[in-house]
């Protein structure tokens, strides 16, 4: 048994879709969530930049006592997951694998659409997954530039529909009947996707599978929380705390008090993150999301 928190991070608020599912499946676990909003979205960054950011974030989460880390970002998982495991072997580090395998099993037309960032499609993880799981299925790769930004900002619904129609049309014209959400921001617009695409389209959110895998890993390693009290949750952001708090209210109905931390250039030009305050603001989860 281990009552230390789980670390969860993303470039912004997208990883809250994973955080939400972990809270649902593992209500007694505490979570330290970090949003690197100074660099959002990672999909627009180079692989070298993303690895540097993720390395520093994992270091901070481990320093804060996290017993496991979830890379709640498809781009970061595609680019940096194995390197992070090599750099930080003291804790289990989980990432997001594109949910191509379940999509293939569900598709009747044998055409699967994947919505993601360019970096996710270019990553070795995505290529390996497609090569392993989709040998007899057509995979339509749909780059969704601007969609993560919309989720971060909460711009107009009209703008969202314009974006989604442009992304969905090529996949639907290719006869895709199953779509994989390959970015953790996208589950926050899943209802609009379903409304625009029609009730027959299957849309796969990978967050439930990630939370289930986390539960399995914690159990196997004896890291499950030894309490029946609801977990305590803490939120950090490298960007403006007020805008993160507003995004949490908009996306989750959750009134949080986020702490701001700042990036700095350490010895030998190495990126580092300032330590958060020693008196954390911990919050209980809401009754419903």
Residue ranges and their predicted role:
Residues 1-289:
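Non-catalytic structural scaffold of enzyme domains
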